[in-house]
Amino acid sequence: MARNLITDVPGVLVGNAGDAKLGSGVTVIVFESPVTASVDVRGGGPGTRETALLDPAQTVEGIDAIVLSGGSAFGLDAASGVQAWLREQGRGFQVREARVPIVPGAILFDLLSGGDKNWGRYPPYRELGYEAAKQASVDFALGSVGAGLGATTANLKGGIGSASAKTRAGITVGAIAAANAAGSMTIGNTRHFWAAPFEQNAEFGGQGWPSSLPADALAFRSKGYPGENTTLAVVATDAKLTKAQAKRVAVMAQSGLSRAIHPVHTPLDGDVVFAAGIGTTSLPDPVFALSELGTLAAHVLARAIARGVYEATALSFAGAMPSWRDRFG
């Protein structure tokens, strides 16, 4: 039975770990076996790890997990915790007798969203990464969890969202996003989401499109300063993809951000989209089937971003950003 989560793609597991006192956390996408993946970076201030090897020209073909973390650059440590867990499972790229788990990742800035960030000498993200990997399952929570725990947007609390769909040929596409954008996911000051045209089964409230656009709908609104914002996402499919095909899916999926966030891809953001092909069946047509797959990936990602905001709950700290439910019920 479909969960409307990225884990509807067989072989994908997701784990979240967070620290309420810290106001930050980690989300890990674990693949049950190595997968082909690539990445597309559009934001002006990204923070990433091991994304260079996802270029189609590079040698390593399979990755074991992808990490999305809070904590800004400190959160890059989370991938080391995930590596440690994978190593315990005997996973990783084999070089003679050695195995090295391949774990790309990306981070978002939540250092000023509230919480106690005075963690001492070493940040806690390595342990949070390990715990998130250990918790990885087909079922997982949405909203203010994992990398979405401290996430915010221009006007509302952000969070972790996910969604899935199938192509006409029955290929499954799933997405997960940590919404921490400089822009807004809602139209002006209304309850309506920019992603409303793509919504399925009232998954983010069924509010639809406003009867008329409010006067402030297209007004520029933004949160924070350069380096403080980003939307991180992973799209996955049960089709077999080459690295070049995964790259094209990641590029096309970035349109999902444009459909769900206004404004987006600004110098203030660090937007990153990973794409992974998990199946053993190649696309029936390398051009048209890939075009449909990438188009659907954008739709699914737009839905996941809106769900992340819809499912979020406000943090308990003074001055914390209100959630969608706080404002609109």
Question: Where in the sequence are the language-model features?
Answer:
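A structural signal for small-residue-enriched, beta-sheet-centric alpha/beta enzyme cores
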Residues: 1-73, 77-80, 87-329
